[in-house]
Swiss-Prot record:
Residues 6-144 form the SprT-like domain. The keyword Cytoplasm applies. GO terms for biological process: response to stress. It comes from Shouchella clausii (strain KSM-K16) (Alkalihalobacillus clausii). Pfam families: SprT-like, Zn_ribbon_SprT. Keywords: Cytoplasm, Metal-binding, Zinc. Its main location: cytoplasm. The active site is at residue 68. This is Protein SprT-like.
C-alpha cells in the first residue's frame, strides 16, 4: 500500500465512521517501532507503522486508523483527545476502534556470550564489554559467541 492509497483509505474511513472529512495528511513512517500509529498535534497529520500492515493486514490497519482518527477529530473539536479522557473512550467504543494494536515487536535479538574457562553461557539483550566484565562463576574471560533472533508467540 502506498501513501496515496493510505490517504484515500483514511479519508474514506473518516467519512464513513465519523461523518467528518479528514483534511490533513496520513502517511507511513518506517521509524515507528513500538506503536501502531500516532496523531501529530501540531500538524494534525497521522503517521502509521507500515509493519502493522505488512504483518497483520488491512483489518488491523483500519483499526489503527480509526483509533488515530478519534484523536484527530476530538482534538479539532476541542474535546478530550487523550487516552484517559471520557470522550475518547466513548468514541473508541462507538466506532469499534481498538484501544491497543497488536504488538509491533515480534522478534527479539539476544546476544550469547560464553566463559572461556568454565563454558558457562550468558544470554543478554545488550552488548557486554568483554574487556571489563568477567564470568560471575569463575572470573574467567567472556567471549562473544553468537547473535540469536527469538520469535515471540502470537
Amino acid at each position: 500500500m502506498t501513501n496515496k492509497e493510505l490517504q484515500q483509505l483514511t479519508e474514506t474511513i473518516s467519512l464513513a465512521f465519523f461523518k467528518r472529512p479528514f483534511t490533513h495528511t496520513a502517511r507511513f513512517n518506517n521509524r515507528l517501532r513500538t506503536t501502531g500509529g500516532r496523531y501529530l498535534l501540531k500538524s494534525h497529520d497521522i503517521e502509521l507503522n507500515p509493519k502493522q500492515y505488512e504483518r497483520y493486514g488491512k483489518e488491523e490497519l483500519i483499526g489503527i486508523i480509526k483509533h488515530e482518527l478519534c484523536h484527530y477529530h476530538l482534538h479539532l473539536e476541542g474535546k478530550g483527545y487523550k487516552h484517559g479522557d471520557k470522550d475518547f473512550q466513548e468514541w473508541l467504543a462507538k466506532t469499534g476502534a481498538p484501544r491497543y494494536c497488536k504488538t509491533a515487536q515480534d522478534e527479539q535479538t539476544v546476544l550469547v556470550y560464553t566463559c572461556t574457562s568454565c563454558s558457562r553461557t550468558y544470554h543478554r539483550r545488550r552488548k557486554i564489554n568483554t574487556q571489563k566484565y568477567v564470568c560471575g562463576t569463575c572470573h574467567g574471560k567472556l567471549k562473544f559467541l553468537s547473535k540469536k533472533v527469538l520469535h515471540q508467540r502470537k
